[in-house]
Amino acid sequence: MRIAVPNKGRLHDPSVTLLERAGLHVEGAAERKLYADTVDPDVRLLFARAADIPQYVRDGAAAVGITGRDQVIESGCDLIELVDLEFGRCQLVLAAPEDGALSSPADVAGGSVATEFPRVTRQYLKDNAVDAEIVEVTGATELTPHVEMADAIVDITSTGTTLRMNGLTVIDEVLESSVRLYAHPERVDDSKVEQLVTAFNSVLAAEGKRYLMMNAPQDRLDAVREVIPGLGGPTVMDVAGEDTVAVHVVVDERDVFEIVSKLKTVGASGILVTEIERLVE
């Protein structure tokens, strides 16, 4: 099975890191090459531009691909979304000069919009009943209103900082995007694809979770249970030869500080907090 992965840019490193955390160690990931093997002899990576990955998956060059939702929609490829990988979050927005007269999508009517996403922009304008010329560019989209190439732009932003630095303001949100795992419709039920989905979901499920282990007197167990309403309830094991139990539980990371303090108060001891690499639910 081939997995198409972004070959560079802000999506490459998080994608490779996720694969590593999911148990697919990538051999020679830091090297500049088109392919990379993994610890699984049946799984190979194919490195490509994020914008090209939808076509690679559509045409069967890869069974699955890791790329942005914006790229898949722009490509028009009929792919199946399997997992939102929860990184690379951004918005595609309609923006215009902050000192100009455009303040709503309707104001763009009769004007022009520069973008690297002509398909998405065309559909957005149609949905908003706006007739405007689309100026297709391949970079430096923020520059176009300032050199009179376009009245507005449709472009990707994460925080809006770059837009503000270039004297632009957001008029409307076109779509939200994040990096996701996509599959060719005919490969969704492949066993390797299902294994990959399970592995990715286990990494995502472990985010923001911690594993707590502790000892507690048998007669304080009920009090301990009240403190830790964790994932599925705590696991309790007798400690041989002692009137003590070992308690294990998964809790939200944000609750650890308060929970540990309360556990000490009710008599727990030997409290150990560890990170969780993967959590299969």
Swiss-Prot record:
Catalytic activity: 1-(5-phospho-beta-D-ribosyl)-ATP + diphosphate = 5-phospho-alpha-D-ribose 1-diphosphate + ATP
SUPFAM superfamilies reported in the protein's UniProt record: GlnB-like, Periplasmic binding protein-like II
Coiled coil: none
Signal peptide range: none
Cellular-component GO terms for this entry: cytoplasm
Documented activity regulation: Feedback inhibited by histidine.
Keyword list, A-Z: Amino-acid biosynthesis, ATP-binding, Cytoplasm, Glycosyltransferase, Histidine biosynthesis, Magnesium, Metal-binding, Nucleotide-binding, Transferase
Required cofactor names: Mg(2+)
Pfam families assigned to the protein according to its UniProt record, in alphabetical order: HisG, HisG_C
CDD domains per record: PBP2_HisGL4
EC supergroup of this enzyme: transferase
Pathway in which this enzyme or protein is active: Amino-acid biosynthesis; L-histidine biosynthesis; L-histidine from 5-phospho-alpha-D-ribose 1-diphosphate: step 1/9
GO biological process: L-histidine biosynthetic process
Localisation per UniProt entry: Cytoplasm
Enzyme Commission (EC) number: 2.4.2.17
A Gene Ontology molecular function term of the record: ATP phosphoribosyltransferase activity
Family designation: Belongs to the ATP phosphoribosyltransferase family. Long subfamily.
Protein task: Catalyzes the condensation of ATP and 5-phosphoribose 1-diphosphate to form N'-(5'-phosphoribosyl)-ATP (PR-ATP). Has a crucial role in the pathway because the rate of histidine biosynthesis seems to be controlled primarily by regulation of HisG enzymatic activity.
NCBIfam families per UniProt: hisG, HisG_C-term
Name of this protein: ATP phosphoribosyltransferase
